[in-house]
């Protein structure tokens, strides 16, 4: 009845032995075996007995062993609008799509590269735009942090990079590749370090591309804010500001624009299109001049004005400015007012 016991023992031994293979070599590292300090008895008591056979030395190990670099490969940052990368691409490469407002995509990328070189106080040693290549001079892509008190004696690595632009035939997409071609430094140039440096150089250009396009978008919004205010006449022959924008669009938003120019809206007549507003000049403060937010001053006197918004025969909109008595402003005043309003639209980036 007990014949199964030896077999069961044999199986259990085999299983236990096979399970030993799952342990890594660090499982029995000496750091895992420690003995604490022996119990310290008070002076009035005797020390507990301890068998010398089982006595172990107290282990002294540093809790901060030598650091090992486990940093992952660097990533190309697709922060710029219209930028993307291909999965599993081994090169430091990014693609740019031609966004609205960019006339020549390759020129926009070249300007971004040149701006990065200027920030690093270097220039290109080789430049061939027909081949789409640029080789930089020596510079430090990674700059150590400096202390204002002690300075920094740490040696700086220097690199030279080759940037390559490849534009598709349709000129709507272009790729930019960064390649490390030379290196000076105390550290050994490993494959990981090479990849990190290349991606870092590429990301600097991507950041500059993103910054420049954001500025371009702001300029485009400012240009869109101009409603083509021109001197003209309303349907009754009075001097007025004329725009090609539709009546409903101008009438709905023009009162809000006036409030940004120190006007206080008194009345809006939806039926006649007449806006009555009080104008008071605002004194600029020191903080306004520092932050570039000085109020726009119009070439008109303080007081109440009436602005008649009307449809033109051409399908646009006319703005007839009158004083508090309902008399149309002089053509010279209208000319200065037209220039001031356009400047305000551009400065604030307002789109009516």
From Swiss-Prot:
**Quaternary context:** Part of the Bam complex.
GO BP terms in the entry: Gram-negative-bacterium-type cell outer membrane assembly; protein insertion into membrane
* Lipid attachment, kind N-palmitoyl cysteine: 20
User: Which Pfam families does the UniProt entry name for this protein?
Assistant: Lipoprotein_18 (PF06804)
Give the signal peptide as a residue range, or say none if absent.
1-19
According to its record, what are the GO cellular component terms? cell outer membrane
Native source organism of the sequence: Pseudoalteromonas sp. (strain SM9913)
Superkingdom of this entry's organism? Bacteria
Does the record bear Cytoplasm in its keywords? no
This protein's name: Outer membrane protein assembly factor BamC
User: Which terms are listed as keywords in the entry?
Assistant: Cell outer membrane, Lipoprotein, Membrane, Palmitate, Signal
- Attached lipid, kind S-diacylglycerol cysteine, located at 20
The record's subcellular location field reads: Cell outer membrane
What family name appears in the similarity comment? Belongs to the BamC family.
Question: Which function does this protein serve?
Answer: Part of the outer membrane protein assembly complex, which is involved in assembly and insertion of beta-barrel proteins into the outer membrane.
Topological category with respect to the lipid bilayer: Lipid-anchor
Gene that this polypeptide is encoded by: bamC
């Amino acid at each position: 009845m007990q014949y199964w016991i030896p077999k069961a023992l044999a199986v259990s031994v085999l299983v236990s032995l096979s399970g030993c293979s799952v342990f890594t070599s660090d499982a029995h590292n000496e750091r895992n075996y420690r003995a604490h300090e022996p119990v310290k008895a008070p002076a009035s008591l005797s020390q507990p007995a301890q068998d010398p056979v089982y006595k172990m030395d107290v282990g002294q190990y540093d809790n901060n062993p030598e650091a090992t670099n486990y940093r992952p490969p660097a990533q190309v940052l697709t922060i710029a609008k219209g930028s993307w990368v291909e999965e599993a691409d081994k090169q430091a490469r990014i693609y740019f799509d031609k966004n609205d407002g960019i006339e020549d995509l390759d020129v926009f990328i070249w300007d971004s590269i040149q701006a990065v070189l200027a920030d690093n106080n270097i220039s290109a040693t080789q430049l061939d735009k027909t081949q789409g290549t640029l080789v930089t001079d020596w510079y430090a892509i990674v700059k150590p942090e400096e202390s204002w008190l002690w300075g920094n004696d740490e040696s700086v690595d220097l690199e030279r990079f080759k940037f390559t632009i490849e534009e598709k035939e349709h000129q709507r997409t272009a790729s930019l590749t960064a390649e490390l071609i030379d290196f000076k430094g105390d550290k050994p140039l490993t494959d990981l370090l090479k990849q990190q440096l290349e991606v870092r150089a590429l990301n600097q250009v991507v950041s500059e591309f993103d910054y420049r396009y954001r500025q371009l978008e702001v300029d485009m919004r400012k240009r869109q804010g101009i409603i083509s205010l021109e001197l003209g006449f309303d349907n009754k022959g009075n001097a007025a500001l004329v725009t090609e924008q539709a009546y409903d669009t101008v009438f709905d938003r023009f009162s809000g624009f006036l409030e940004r120019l120190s006007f206080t809206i008194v009345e809006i007549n939806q039926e006649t299109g007449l806006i009555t507003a009080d104008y008071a000049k605002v004194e600029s403060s020191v903080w306004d001049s520092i932050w570039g937010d000085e109020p726009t001053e119009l070439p008109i006197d303080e007081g109440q004005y009436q602005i008649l918004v009307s449809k033109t025969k051409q399908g646009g909109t006319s703005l007839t400015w009158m004083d508090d008595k309902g008399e149309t402003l002089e053509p010279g005043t209208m000319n200065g007012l037209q220039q001031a309003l356009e400047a305000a639209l551009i400065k604030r980036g307002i789109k009516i």
